C-alpha cells in the first residue's frame, strides 16, 4: 500500500526534500543518462506543491506541481516519477490521479499543462490531456506538450 502526501513546498521536511531530489536524480539523470541541472529553483517557491508516494518508508512515486504567479498561465505538472521497482504496478495511474486531484482542489478553474515524454502520450491522454505541440527534443529525449482543460464537477 502506498501512502500519499500532497505538500506545499513550505511543508517539506529536509528528509522529504532529500528523498525527492534523490529519486529525481536516480531516474532522470542516472537511469535516463541525461545529465542536467535538476535543481532549477522552482521546488521551493510560490504556491508550488509536491505529491509524494511512500512505500515502507521509501519514496517510490513523485510529481511536482508549479503554480505561476501569472493567473493567465496554466498549472504545470512535471518531474513525474515512479521508481523502477514499482513500474508496471499501476502506481503511475495512482500518482496522476492524486496529482490531478490536488490541481482540482487548489486551482479548480485552471487548465493543466505538462511536457510529456512522447512515449507516454497515450498514458496522459487517458487522463484527459491532449497534445498541444509537435514532438520536440528536451535533453535528448522526445517530448510533447499536453494540456487538460478545466473539468467541471
UniProtKB/Swiss-Prot annotation:
GO terms for molecular function: N-acetyltransferase activity. It comes from the Bacteria. It holds the Pfam family Acetyltransf_10. This is Protein ElaA. Disulfide bonds: none annotated. It comes from Escherichia coli (strain K12). Residues 7-151 form the N-acetyltransferase domain. InterPro entries: Acyl_CoA_acyltransferase (IPR016181), GNAT_dom (IPR000182). Transmembrane segments: none annotated. Belongs to the UPF0039 (ElaA) family. The gene is elaA.
